[in-house]
Amino acid sequence: MADVAKLCDELLALTILEAKELNDLLEEKGIKAAAAVAVAGPAGGGDAPAAEEKDEFDVVLTGAGDKKINVIKEVRAITGLGLKEAKDLVEGAPKAVKEAASKTEAEEIKAKLEAAGASVELK
């Protein structure tokens, strides 16, 4: 067991160049790095894996509706864009208003835009 721990410490101490050389030597011996990834799969029953919940969302404005001016004002407040940029974003729908927002932030932005009369999607 001590030999394995020592080997582990030595592997962790390798520089990137040394790790690349080790990888090349292992490939010459027929051991591919991708093979280890293919072997590691979900264990157990035949059930489909549970869908992972996203933690980042893009808030996409899909339409301005009848109250375009209110939507432009809300887009300006959310993004900090100037009047022309906000107007171009609203008129160029579908466009992302906010990218990589947290779930709560994305839902708040969606609620604000929908209250202003816009149609919004979270992606």
Swiss-Prot record:
Report which superkingdom the organism of origin falls in. Answer: Bacteria
Which is an annotated GO molecular function term of this record?
mRNA binding
Cross-referenced InterPro entries, in alphabetical order? Ribosomal_bL12, Ribosomal_bL12_C, Ribosomal_bL12_C/ClpS-like, Ribosomal_bL12_oligo, Ribosomal_bL12_oligo_N_sf
Protein's GO biological process: translation
Listed A to Z, the keywords are: Ribonucleoprotein, Ribosomal protein
Q: Gene Ontology cellular component? A: cytosolic large ribosomal subunit
Its family remark reads:
Belongs to the bacterial ribosomal protein bL12 family.
Query: Oligomeric state and partners?
Result: Homodimer. Part of the ribosomal stalk of the 50S ribosomal subunit. Forms a multimeric L10(L12)X complex, where L10 forms an elongated spine to which 2 to 4 L12 dimers bind in a sequential fashion. Binds GTP-bound translation factors.
Function (record text) = Forms part of the ribosomal stalk which helps the ribosome interact with GTP-bound translation factors. Is thus essential for accurate translation.
By its UniProt entry, which HAMAP family does this protein fall under?
A: Ribosomal_bL12 (MF_00368)
What name appears for this protein in its UniProt entry? Large ribosomal subunit protein bL12
* Native source species: Maricaulis maris (strain MCS10)
